[in-house]
Amino acid sequence: MVMPKVCIIGAGCSGFTTAKRLKDHGIPFDVFEASDDIGGNWYFNNPNGMSACYQSLHIDTSKWRLAFEDYPVPADWPDYPHHSLLLQYFHDYVDHFGLREHITFNTRVENAARLPEGGWRITLSTGEVRHYDALAVANGHHWAARIPDYPGHFDGAQIHSHLYRTPFEPVNCIGKRVLVVGLGNSAMDIASELSQRPIAEKLFVSARRGVWIFPKYIGGKPGDKNPDPAWMPRWLRQKIGERIIRKLIGTMPDYGLPEPEYGMFQSHGTVSGEFLVRAGSGDLTMRPGVERLDGDGVVFTDGSREQVDVIVWATGYDIRFPFFKDPAFTADSDNRPPPLYKRILKPGTPDLFYMGLAQPLPTLVNFAEQQSKLVAAYLSGQYLPPPPAKMERVIKADEDYYTGQYYAARRHTIQLDFDHYVLALKKELAHGAKRAKAAGNAPPVQPRAPEGIAA
């Protein structure tokens, strides 16, 4: 049987795990990567500008949760590896499974246009045009930095956390009064680093609301190593979780931080092993949300003002697909991507797959590895989704479950519970296999350009 040929955009962990799965199933593919090597967000100083790695970064997911199913992490790894170890793990994976020869580096997909009869016309940065039967989008969602637009002007230096590398680069923060805006993982890491007394003269953190901060260790073990079972009701998980956190670390106001306005699983929690210590030690000072910029300082929503030299905006990212010109395939003005079945398939577009487009707790690293099981089974005729009408109903139910519990915010549009998702995906694959068998196991995407050559 001739298989459809797939174009994969991106050679980060979502792209190369998808490639590995397609290779296992004998499905031809090409991967196009804008940078000169693999790794995406985890490639420090990535020349494509899409990495948010800073020099001191350690992943906040333990090695047990981020490991790929068929390629264990090294036994001598620490619980929370440095980004350089993770990148080496990615390189070892790609080389072990012979994927590098399928990746074209320094080549950006400039345009991906769906053809009326199906399939995709792919225009590359080299000017070359190729045709593919299917498209897998794995361009990541942590690269299009979002900076809020506040009134006023600021005379000092300001950067998004995406650009932060060290206390000296790209802005020298030594001896400066620094404001970090945000309370996400990057905000807490950067604030903790800069708040050390030999670095910033004074460190402020601005946040519109409080968040739940989870410890990295519980009982001497990584907190995510033994998660609650996926079947546990959400309300019970929240009740137990809040009780454990309060018993282990107390309340956020105990450290001079604002009390969270929402329950533990109603907002995106933050994992930090250092921020609470810095806050409790007086090394950083909390401020409410920013009201306006004011020359050499910032005015906050409570009317207070602080003189600052540097602002680090740790204010998140927008979801973007610059190669799509059709708005039906892009995120809307509220940062919501198109409705996707199992976060992968767009009803009515059977030859398009979104890979890794989620904010799964606790990990994104091996998320697309799970999704790729459905994609490979689908392209080889071993899986068939339900009719479009049912797909739409399931999409709504899934989104109500995964994002409905969170307060409305741009950062919460792609939230997801990893373990619950994987369990549901396993069941869906079994149902889809039965549907495919009843339909004669015919691949839903028929090969039109098996060589993926210019037409």
Q: What is each model feature region?
A:
Residues 227:
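Conformationally flexible catalytic loops at phosphate/diphosphate-handling active centers
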Residues 55-63:
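A structural motif shared across PLP-dependent enzymes of the aminotransferase-like
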Residues 64-72:
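Short, basic/glycine-rich phosphate-binding loops at helix/coil junctions
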Residues 393-406:
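Short, mixed-charge aromatic SLiMs
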Residues 2-56, 72-211, 216-217, 231-388, ...:
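Flavin (primarily FAD) cofactor-binding/catalytic cores of flavoenzymes
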